Amino acid sequence: MKFMKKIIISVSALFAFGAAMMGQNLDPTVEVSRVYEGKLIEVHKPALEMSVPDTLHKFDLGFDYWVFDNPYKGSYEFKPYVMEMRPSSVQRHKNTFFLQAGAGYTVHPTLDLLWSPIKKGAFSMDVYANHRSYIGEYRAIEQIPAWDGYDLMSKAGIDFGYDWQKADFDFGASYFGIADKDYRRDRMFNAVDAYVSLKSKSLWSKKFIYNIDLAYRFAEDAAVSKMNIHDLSLDASFGQGSKKGSRILFDLGMDMSAYSGALESSAARFYVVPHYVYTKGILSLDLGVRVSVVKASGDAFGNMNQIVYPDVRMDLALVPDALKMYLNVGGGDKLQTYSSLIEKNHHIDLSYGLAGNGSLMGVTVERVSAVLGFEGRISSHFSYNLRTGYVNYKSAPLDAVGSVGCQYVPMLGYSPYQKAFTALDWNMAFQSVRFDGSVVYNLAWGIENADFIGLSAVEGDAAFAYSWNSRINAGVDCNFASGRSSAAGFKVPGYADLGVFGEYVFNRKISLWLRGGNLLNMEIQRNLLFAEKGINFTAGICLNL
């Protein structure tokens, strides 16, 4: 109770600070403070002009924009090429109606819907919906026999926006739901989300700039037993600009999660980042220090928080508009909330908590990370991002395997470890041909528990697409990962999810599409001990009215 009172007092103080900022006679100019605007290059990733509005990328389950890669990745982060189709900006008009729907065998029904009924002057409104699911047989793995189940995910919401001359104000609400059945239990997860955002447009000026993002989720999970969830986040940035290309900025915020029912617990993270931003010529510097504190009821996380972390970025335009070198040195922490874990793996429930290593919900603590990279392009047809780095985790989530009787069960725990990596992203695009992808090499060591499953040494994806006369679009893609294993000897096989896709465009408003997946019929365990069975094909229609 005392812990919750402290959280409420801290949240009230943050809201009061935000209200004070709003009450000043300021130009309504807001922007995310970590955006760097200088004379550095922007490497754009050209794409074939397909037929999905950018707004539909609200359906992405989240990206981690930290310096370090997310150490715990679920099965929903890879999105096949057909699901990534997007139009050029000229395809959007005042009143947009977009629908993409498909079904096939095995049963993978999909639905994307966007309706923009109001775009008058500065005001806009978008209504959207999304559905992804699998219904059918799952493969037999180890001592687990084949079984029939389903995994359904739906999202629907409404967004409102107001575009001032120097600021953007957005707010909205949405529903997010998961229903799944596996060999252990059934689950129904329902969540209602709401957010408010205020962002300035003018970055490099003498004016006071600020940014406020507020989000709240209420969720109810009925899996092993019923649990209520409250997630709240507040992020604010502010600072004084300067025409000389430098300024001092402050980022601050909090994340809080509270649980009742099957689990009585709460946790919160508070952070502040003062940093100095300087740009001159080809050089851009962002020198900051992150101060962050994580607290949990009953001291559930123990002494996991480092409190002070580096937060430094340097960009150097070696060849203006062609080659940029960057260096990031960072660190930080992040709450692994019940909601965020479920969105990465729909099968997770409270039974996943690994005995002796804390509860299912924990905190990722990155002591320090360093990334050196080169981002550039060769002519207007080829762009790339090559980087190498090192990460030292004090605590990070990892898959693990336990047993109940003679049957394996999936689990999740937290461990310190270190990682070195090298990664390459590339895109080659001509008028009718596109080839892009990414590949990462990981070398991890220092994982403490023998039951933890390590990282894949190599993972990535690639896609090749051809557009014939803007009428037929076709290609092949592949998402792949090498095998993983634990020190105790449990092995997760590697895989290559080979797919083909095609689209026939009747006109600007209607097209038909087809996708085939897992053509090599491999055992793909993106979620530990869960693998959908067999080759699959999905066909559908796309309307853009």
Show the residue positions of the predicted features.
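Transmembrane beta-barrel strands of outer-membrane/channel proteins
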Residues: 101-103, 127-131, 171-177, 212-218, ...
